[in-house]
Swiss-Prot record:
It comes from Prochlorococcus marinus (strain MIT 9215). This is tRNA pseudouridine synthase B. NCBIfam families: TruB. One of its GO terms (molecular function) is tRNA pseudouridine(55) synthase activity. Responsible for synthesis of pseudouridine from uracil-55 in the psi GC loop of transfer RNAs. HAMAP family: TruB_bact (MF_01080). It is an enzyme of class 5 (isomerase). The active site is at D41. One of its GO terms (biological process) is mRNA pseudouridine synthesis. Belongs to the pseudouridine synthase TruB family. Type 1 subfamily. Its EC number is 5.4.99.25. The gene is truB.
């Protein structure tokens, strides 16, 4: 089956790993160069963007925030920090109002430090934490800084001790850790009951598709692929209109920048990436302004010579 470079936004089912999805897409599209943009736990459903072909090189330039809707069960602590783990403690939960509960949630908004679950893909001395955990090894994980951009209380089921939240966060945030820690500050216990990712890396569930639908499409499956350049709409664009400039770019040489661009472009900070295109709006790669803002230095070059 023929394929195009770009992104497939998979609506992942429960029980399927992110790597399982990648393997299925490789087989369906008959291409080896496939990678996902961030692991979803097997029990988590929802949006899983998958890069195809040269799009795998652009993953780091996608928006990094992700949005979830999750349910937290108070009163239960497990060894995995979700409902599927072994119960290690149970405790009653407080009978508080939504307003009071939201006050507690405020502690998780902004930049916070969290200790990842021990059953996680975090590396510990060169090995995944979950492997050590499954061997019942004793180890500690260091707190990591994450950013919670939005955290909304959607529902508080006080009778059953279930909190429904919507959360927009940085890459690397563990919602299981938030469930565990929220239970702790409420003088109870907490674990993640259910989680759905509704957006990731600039893609949302409206643009997602089930792998079963891709299978049904067969040779027409590439029609679901979103072009790489469309996934980079959040990045300012610089156009190369001369063959000489394009040749310079494709041979890895810096391009002298048009001064008028600096007045129109939002990204004056040389640390911000620019997507470089030709006169037909075909993507040529990613570059960065130099310290003097006089040239664009190539960082990622498609069709390099």
């Amino acid at each position: 089956m023929e394929t195009n470079d770009g992104f497939l936004v998979i609506n992942k089912d429960k029980g399927c790993t992110s790597h399982d999805c990648v393997k299925q897409i490789r087989k369906l599209l008959n291409t080896k160069k496939v990678g996902h943009t961030g692991t979803l736990d097997p029990e988590v459903i929802g949006t899983l963007p998958i890069a195809i072909g040269s799009a795998t090189r652009f993953i780091q330039y996608l928006p990094q925030s992700k949005t979830y809707i999750g349910k937290i069960k108070l009163g239960i602590r497990t060894n995995t920090d979700d409902i599927h783990g072994e119960i290690i403690n149970q405790k009653s939960w407080p009978k508080i109002s939504e307003e009071k509960l939201d006050q507690y949630l405020k502690r998780f908004r902004g930049i916070i430090k969290q200790v990842p679950p021990k059953v996680s893909s975090v590396h510990v001395n060169g090995e995944r934490a979950y492997k050590k955990s499954f061997r019942n090894e004793i180890f500690e994980l260091a707190p990591r800084e994450v950013k919670i951009k939005e955290l909304t209380l959607m529902k508080w089921d006080q009778i059953n001790g279930i909190i429904t939240i919507k959360i927009k966060c940085s890459s690397g945030t563990y919602i299981r850790a938030i469930a565990r820690d929220l239970g702790g500050i409420l003088n109870s216990e907490g674990c993640l009951l259910q989680l759905k990712r509704i957006s990731a890396c600039g893609f949302d569930e409206q643009s997602s598709i089930k792998i079963s639908d891709i299978e049904k499409a067969k040779k027409n499956a590439p029609k679901f692929i979103i072009p790489t350049i469309s996934a980079l709409d959040h990045i300012s664009t610089y156009s190369l209109n001369k063959d000489e400039e394009i040749n310079y770019w494709q041979t890895g040489r810096a391009i002298k920048i048009d001064i008028n661009f600096l007045y129109e472009c939002k990204a004056f900070d040389y640390k911000q990436p620019l997507k470089v295109v030709d006169s037909r709006k075909m993507l040529l790669g990613i570059g960065f302004l130099d310290d003097d803002h006089t040239k664009i230095n190539p960082k990622l070059v498609l069709n390099a010579k």
